[in-house]
From Swiss-Prot:
One of its GO terms (molecular function) is polyribonucleotide nucleotidyltransferase activity. InterPro entries: ExoRNase_PH_dom1 (IPR001247), ExoRNase_PH_dom2 (IPR015847), ExoRNase_PH_dom2_sf (IPR036345), KH_dom (IPR004087), KH_dom_type_1 (IPR004088), KH_dom_type_1_sf (IPR036612), NA-bd_OB-fold (IPR012340), PNPase (IPR012162). NCBIfam families: polynuc_phos, PRK11824.1. Belongs to the polyribonucleotide nucleotidyltransferase family. Mg(2+) binds at residues 495, 501. Its cofactor is Mg(2+). This is Polyribonucleotide nucleotidyltransferase.
Length: 721
C-alpha cells in the first residue's frame, strides 16, 4: 500500500499529512502529525435514507491511552465511555464543520478523529479540527471548505500560535479560532479578564494563521489532482412556498408584531396559522399541485412554513429594528436575581432569571480529597473546580426520559466552568474543592450564560472570595446580503432562526470566556469585533442587577460546610509529618478527628466540621515542623526511661533526652527516683548536637516557668500513638 505524503511548514513547525494509506473504506482519511502527536481522521458519507431538514452529521473524537504509553485502569483494562475531554473535542470538530455542509444535502456524514500518539508540546484538538476538513476534501464530499483551526495563547504581551499545554497554563489566553475562506466560523476561548481590544486582536491574529492552513489544503488538493466539490443546491419547487407566501405572510407578520405575546402564546398562534393552512390545503381538489406535494411529503408544509416564518422575522429585524418581543436590538430582557434561596445545608444557592430563562445554581464546598481525578490524555491530573449543567425536559415544556448528560450539557457546563475559573481564589487563600450545579428550570435562550450568572451568585452565597463577579450574555446576528444586524441577549427563536450564537462572559475588567457558533459559512473579524464590543454594556448591566442580590462573599460559611485550614510547611519536612508508615499523621487525624492532605509542594490542608479541631491539628503539625532552638523552655511528657536518662516529648512527635546528670542539681542514682513515664515536666533545650539530636535539662528550670510553642503558658502534649 502506498499513500501520498505532504509536509506543511507552519509557524516554524512541520505538519505531516498522509492520505490514501489508512482506512481505505472511508470516503476520505488523513494521518495528520506534528511533533510526536499523531491523529487519524476519517470522513465517511452514506446516501441519505429519507428527506430531512437537518444535517445528520456525527463527529467523534477518540482518545486511546496507548497514545501516552499508559494502560487503562479498572478491571477490564480498556477504555470505557469517552471522557469529558473527548466529548469537548468532538464538539470542537462538529461546530466549525456543521455550517459548511448544506442542510438540504441530507446525506449521513461521520467524522472520526483518533488520537494515536500525544506529544505534550502539541495539543491534539486543533489538529483534529483541521484534519476533519482535509479528510472531507480528499473524500470528495460536498463541502464549503477548506476549513482550519489554530490556537492562540498570550504570554506577556506576545501572541503565540498553537502553544504547548505548559504555555497554555502559564498564559492569560487560550483561544481556538476556526475559519473558512469566507471568514471565521467558530471561536472557543478562556481568558484571564482580557480586554475586548486584546481579545479582538487575538482573533485577528488567529484568522491570519488560519488562512495559511486553508491555502495549504488547496495546494494539497491540487497536488493530488482532486477537484473540490462545492455543494450545488437542487432547484426547489416553488409551488408550496408561493402558496404559503400568498396565504400566510400577513397572519405571520401580525403574530410577530404582537410584542406582548409570551413565547408559548406566540408558538400557539403560529401553530394555529399552520393548522388552518393545512385545512385549506386539504379542502383543495385532489389534483391541485399544492395538495399533491403535501400529501406526498407530510413534513414539507412544516419545513416551508418554518422557512417563511424565519424570512419574515429576519425582515422585521432588518427593516424595522424590532424583535418579536418588542425589544430594541441592543436591549437586554428583564432580569431578576436572588441568593441564599435554599437552606444552608446547601452551602450556597442562587436563582437567576432573564426573560423566560431561569437557572438554579448551587455550590458545594469540598475537601481536597474531593478533587476529580482526570483519567485522560490531558497532562492535568485533577480538577478542583467543577461545574455541572443539567437541562431537564420540563425546562422547555416537554416530556422525555431523563438520562445521563448529553454532549450539549457537557459543553455548556464546560463553558460556564471556564468563565469562572479566572476569578477563583488561590489554593492557599481558599483551599476548598468547589462544585457548582446549574439546573435549568426554564429555557428560552442563553441558558449557559444564565448558568455563569447563577454560578457567581451561588459561589458568593457560599462565602467563596471571588476576585470579581462574572456575568455573561449571548449575542446574535441577522445577515441578509450586505445588511447586518447584531442582537443583544438573544432568546430561543432568535437563536433558532438567526445566523450566530456568540456567548460572551467576563467581569467589569475584561473577558473570561467566549463561544461562537455560526449557521453561515463565515464572518469577517470586523463583525465579530462589533459583537464583542456591544456585549460589554450588556454584561455590565447584568452585573449591576446581580450585585443588587449579593455584592460580596458571605462573611461566614454554612455551618454544614467543612472547615479547612491551609498553610505551608517545608517540603523536606513532609516525611516528619507523615511519620514511619504514616503513623504520625494517622495519630494526628485520629486524635483531632480531622482529614489532612499534604501536597508535594508542602501545602497542608486540614478539613474538619469542627474549627477548633482543625486548629488543634494545625498546632500539632506546626510543632512537628518548627525548629527548636537552644534555651527554649517546653512543657513535655516523659515518654520512656533508659538507664542513662529520660526521653521527653516537647512537641508532637519531637523528642529530646534528659541525661541522668541533668535531672537534678543533686546526684541521681536512678532515673526513676526523679521522673517516671507519663510525668509532665518542664525542660529547657540545653543543646542541639551535630546530628540534630535535642539534649534537654531539668536543672535550673522552675516547674511553673515553662512555655510550650506556640502558647505563652505550658500546655501538656500527650504522645501520639
Amino acid at each position: 500500500m502506498e499513500g501520498q505524503n505532504k509536509s506543511i511548514t507552519f509557524d516554524g513547525r512541520e505538519i505531516r499529512l498522509t492520505t490514501g494509506l489508512y482506512a481505505p473504506q472511508a470516503s476520505g482519511s488523513v494521518m495528520i502529525e506534528c511533533g510526536d502527536t499523531s491523529l487519524l481522521v476519517t470522513a465517511t458519507k452514506t446516501a441519505k435514507k429519507e428527506p430531512s431538514d437537518f444535517l445528520p452529521l456525527i463527529c467523534d473524537y477518540e482518545e486511546k491511552l496507548f497514545a501516552a504509553g499508559r494502560i487503562p485502569g479498572g478491571f477490564m483494562r480498556r477504555e470505557g465511555r469517552p471522557p469529558e475531554r473527548a466529548t469537548l473535542i468532538a464538539r470542537l470538530i462538529d461546530r466549525p464543520m456543521r455550517p459548511l455542509f448544506p442542510t438540504w444535502m441530507g446525506d449521513e456524514i461521520q467524522i472520526v478523529a483518533s488520537c494515536l500518539s500525544l506529544d505534550e508540546r502539541v495539543p491534539a484538538d486543533v489538529l483534529a479540527v483541521t484534519g476533519a476538513s482535509i479528510a472531507t476534501l480528499v473524500g470528495e464530499i460536498p463541502f464549503y471548505g477548506p476549513m482550519a483551526a489554530v490556537r492562540v495563547g498570550l504570554i506577556g504581551d506576545d501572541f503565540i500560535l498553537n502553544p504547548s499545554y505548559r504555555e497554555i497554563e502559564k498564559g492569560d489566553l487560550d483561544i481556538v479560532v476556526a475559519g473558512s475562506p469566507d471568514g471565521i466560523v467558530m471561536i472557543e476561548a478562556g481568558a484571564n479578564q482580557l480586554s475586548e481590544q486584546d481579545t479582538i486582536e487575538a482573533i485577528d491574529f488567529g484568522y491570519e494563521a488560519v488562512t495559511e492552513l486553508i491555502k495549504s489544503q488547496e495546494d494539497l488538493l491540487q497536488d493530488l489532482g482532486i477537484k473540490q466539490i462545492k455543494p450545488s443546491e437542487p432547484e426547489e419547487d416553488k409551488t408550496l412556498p408561493s402558496y404559503l407566501e400568498k396565504n400566510c405572510t400577513k397572519p405571520i407578520e401580525l403574530v410577530l408584531k404582537k410584542f406582548d405575546l409570551s413565547k408559548e402564546e406566540r408558538d400557539l398562534e403560529l401553530e394555529k396559522i399552520k393548522t388552518e393552512t393545512q385545512s385549506k390545503i386539504d379542502s383543495l381538489k385532489d389534483d391541485n399541485q399544492v395538495k399533491v406535494l403535501t400529501s406526498e411529503n407530510e413534513k414539507l408544509l412544516h419545513s416551508d412554513f418554518k422557512k417563511l416564518t424565519k424570512k419574515l422575522m429576519r425582515s422585521q429585524i432588518i427593516n424595522d429594528g424590532k424583535r418579536v418581543d418588542g425589544r430594541d436590538l441592543d436591549e437586554v430582557r428583564k432580569i431578576s436575581a436572588s441568593a441564599g434561596i435554599l437552606p444552608k445545608r446547601v452551602h450556597g444557592s442562587a436563582l437567576f432569571q432573564r426573560g423566560l430563562t431561569q437557572v438554579l445554581s448551587t455550590t458545594t464546598l469540598g475537601t481536597p480529597s474531593d478533587a476529580q481525578e482526570m483519567d485522560d490524555l490531558n497532562p492535568s491530573t485533577e480538577k478542583t473546580y467543577l461545574h455541572h449543567y443539567n437541562f431537564p425536559p420540563y425546562s422547555v415544556g416537554e416530556t422525555r426520559p431523563m438520562r445521563t448528560p448529553g454532549r450539549r450539557e457537557i459543553g455548556h457546563g464546560a463553558l460556564a466552568e471556564r468563565a469562572i475559573i479566572p476569578v477563583l481564589p488561590g489554593k492557599e487563600t481558599f483551599p476548598y474543592v468547589l462544585r457548582v450545579v446549574s439546573e435549568v428550570l426554564s429555557s428560552n435562550g442563553s441558558t449557559s450564560m444564565g448558568s455563569v450568572c447563577g454560578s457567581t451568585l451561588s459561589l458568593l452565597d457560599a462565602g467563596v472570595p471571588l476576585k470579581a463577579p462574572v456575568s455573561g450574555t449571548a449575542m446574535g446576528l441577522i445577515k441578509e446580503g450586505k445588511e447586518v444586524r447584531i442582537l443583544t441577549d438573544i432568546q430561543g427563536i432568535e437563536d433558532f432562526l438567526g445566523d450566530m450564537d456568540f456567548k460572551v462572559a467576563g467581569t467589569d475588567k475584561g473577558i473570561t470566556a467566549l463561544q461562537m457558533d455560526m449557521k453561515i459559512t463565515g464572518l469577517p473579524v470586523s463583525i465579530i469585533s462589533d459583537a464583542i464590543k456591544k456585549a460589554r454594556p450588556a454584561r455590565i448591566h447584568i452585573l449591576e442587577k446581580m450585585q443588587g442580590a449579593i455584592d460580596k462573599p458571605q462573611e461566614s460559611l454554612s455551618p454544614h460546610a467543612p472547615r479547612l485550614l491551609s498553610f505551608r510547611i517545608d517540603p523536606e519536612l513532609i516525611g516528619t509529618v507523615i511519620g514511619p508508615g504514616g503513623r504520625t499523621i494517622k495519630g494526628i487525624t485520629e486524635r483531632t478527628n480531622t482529614k489532612i492532605d499534604i501536597e508535594d509542594g508542602g501545602i497542608v490542608t486540614i478539613a474538619s466540621h469542627d474549627g477548633a479541631a482543625a486548629e488543634e491539628a494545625q498546632k500539632i503539625i506546626e510543632g512537628l515542623t518548627r525548629k527548636v532552638h537552644e534555651g527554649e523552655i517546653f512543657s513535655g511528657v516523659v515518654t520512656r526511661i533508659i538507664p542513662i536518662g529520660a526521653f521527653v516529648e516537647i512537641l508532637p512527635g519531637k523528642e529530646g533526652m534528659v541525661h541522668i546528670s541533668q535531672l537534678s542539681e543533686a546526684r541521681v542514682e536512678r532515673v526513676e527516683d526523679v521522673v517516671r513515664q507519663g510525668d509532665e515536666v518542664t525542660v529547657r533545650v540545653r543543646e542541639i548536637d551535630s546530628r540534630g539530636r535535642i539534649n534537654l535539662t531539668l536543672r535550673g528550670v522552675g516547674q511553673n516557668n515553662g512555655m510550650s510553642y506556640p502558647e505563652p503558658t505550658p500546655t501538656p502534649v500527650a504522645p501520639l500513638n
